[in-house]
Swiss-Prot record:
Name of the featured protein: COP9 signalosome complex subunit 5
Gene: RRI1
GO MF term (any one): metallopeptidase activity
Protein source organism: Debaryomyces hansenii (strain ATCC 36239 / CBS 767 / BCRC 21394 / JCM 1990 / NBRC 0083 / IGC 2968)
SUPFAM superfamilies: JAB1/MPN domain
SUBUNIT field: Component of the COP9 signalosome (CSN) complex.
Protein's UniProt keywords contain Transport: no
Length: 469
């Protein structure tokens, strides 16, 4: 609602130079004046009977316009764009003044330079007044308003004829003109209030017609200033109630430029904050240390990385074959070529003698108590050679402890789940350790700004361990 910038208190004194339009600044209303009485008083009956405007052509010197009426006129004029619009005004008559309490638009045909009220417009006017009386609104019609989009507030020849006709039959009558385009450009309501003189009346302070027709449409230039001696302008005073003040504070566009600047500054500030947060996150990632994790968690992460490496390699190479080697020391320990003490130590650390050796998955259950497993030893796996009649190892019947140089699809796929010979309590402990570790890794990942990818890989790692996937 940019056309409603401010409602203001502007007094225009009589002078030799005719001032036909006013730019109203709207929140500067005279706070000391008692305008609340305008809502409760009725028209002055003594003035209505005496009709002093018949003997004094300039009896009415001021018009009071409510903030509601000004808003409605401005919005209506703005909605018409380059097309003229028209409406009626209702109000009251007091000494030397016309009070405009409310306005309503008329369904009329408008062009860029003219507006004509047809029969349906007059019918609408009568019905509106009847309905207003039924709801307790006793105001009568006190005038009409129309718009001049882009070419100022003044009365053309047709406007003068229309206003003179209405003043003869239903005086007091007022004409108001609003320029919505200038209102939008300057941020203040461009408005003028006028009354015409009687026929053959010569105003003593009438000004000569002006030749400045800038912005006036060609069809209106011949009328511009020609009829200026047939009407005069009234001072305009805006008034509002206490309740109107709160509403105007909401819809007022007094600081619309400031709001635009503020919105731009806010966007720039948000962008700067985002960039600063990115750099802070990078610094945090660079300085983050993993020494906060215990040995079990570090070992878990290493195994985690191995499985993730296999998955990514499979995706990149699009090949089911993956080659793996182990060190000679691991070969000796698994093939029995190393010393027995090494084998015994290996068995003690992994508790292989206490479990059924039908498979050997990636073991994370022992790493919570042992030292961190090396990357080399963590890739040792067993191959299932059941049914091999030539196997001489009675203690490990059906298995061949040899380093894997054979092709396989994935380490995780070759590691079958062990048939745990341990108690249910140990299995629960293993599960709890895994869940706790995954939770710690997830929290740690969030601390250093990682995405949900690591949580997903952790879940896949857990499935690989317990399901042998």
């Amino acid at each position: 609602m940019r056309c409603i910038h401010e409602l203001a208190d502007v007094f225009i004194n009589d002078s030799d130079e005719r001032i036909l339009t006013q730019s109203l600044d709207a929140t500067e209303i005279d706070k000391h004046a008692d305008y609340e009485s305008f809502f409760s008083i009725n028209s002055d009956e003594s003035i209505m009977k005496a009709r002093p405007w018949k003997s004094n052509a300039k009896y009415f010197k001021k018009t009071y316009i409510s903030s509601l009426a000004l808003c409605k006129m401005s919005v209506h004029a703005k909605s018409g764009g380059a097309i003229e619009v028209m409406g009626m005004m209702t109000g009251k008559i007091i000494k030397n003044s016309i009070i405009v309490m409310d306005v309503y638009p008329l369904p009329v045909e408008g062009t860029e330079t003219r507006v004509n009220a047809q029969a349906e417009g007059y019918e609408y006017m009568v019905q509106y007044l009847e309905n207003s009386k039924q709801v307790g609104r006793d105001e009568n019609i006190v005038g009409w308003y129309h718009s001049h989009p882009g070419y100022g507030c003044w009365l053309s020849g047709i406007d003068v004829a229309t206003q003179s006709l209405n003043q003869n039959f239903q005086d007091p009558y007022l004409a108001i003109v609003i320029d919505p385009m200038k209102t939008e450009d300057q941020g203040k309501v461009e408005i003028g209030a006028f009354r015409t003189f009687p026929d053959n009346y010569k105003s003593p302070d009438s000004a000569a017609p002006t030749n400045n027709t800038r912005g006036v449409p060609p069809s209106k230039q011949k009328d511009f200033g020609v009829h200026s001696d047939k009407y005069y302008s009234l001072d305009i005073q805006i008034f509002k109630s206490n309740l109107d003040t709160e509403i105007l504070n909401i819809i007022s566009n007094k600081s619309w430029i400031g709001k635009l600047i503020k919105s731009v500054n806010t966007a720039n500030h948000q962008e700067q904050n985002m960039i600063e947060n990115v750099f802070k996150l990078i610094n945090k990632l660079q300085k983050k240390e993993v020494n906060q994790l215990n040995r079990f968690e570090i070992s878990f992460i290493k195994k985690f990385d191995l499985i993730f490496e296999d998955i990514i390699s499979k995706k990149l190479m699009n090949d089911n074959r993956f080659y793996s080697t182990i060190s000679q020391s691991s070969y000796d320990s698994f093939s029995g070529h190393g010393n027995s003490s090494s084998n015994d130590e290996m068995d003690d650390e992994s508790d292989l003698d206490d479990r059924d050796k039908s498979s050997a998955p990636l073991d994370i259950s022992d790493t919570g108590n042992d030292d961190v497993m090396s990357m080399e030893s963590s890739v040792n796996v067993y191959t299932d050679k059941r049914g091999d009649d030539n196997d001489d190892d009675d203690d490990n019947d059906g298995y061949d402890k040899r380093p894997m140089y054979t092709n396989y699809r994935s380490r995780a796929n070759l590691t079958k789940p062990r048939k745990s010979g341990s108690s249910p309590e140990e299995h629960v402990k293993l599960s709890n350790n895994v869940n706790k570790t995954i939770t710690n890794i997830s929290n740690h990942s969030k601390d250093i700004g990682l995405t949900e990818l690591q949580d997903l890989i952790a879940l896949k790692t857990k499935e690989s361990i317990f399901l042998g996937k």
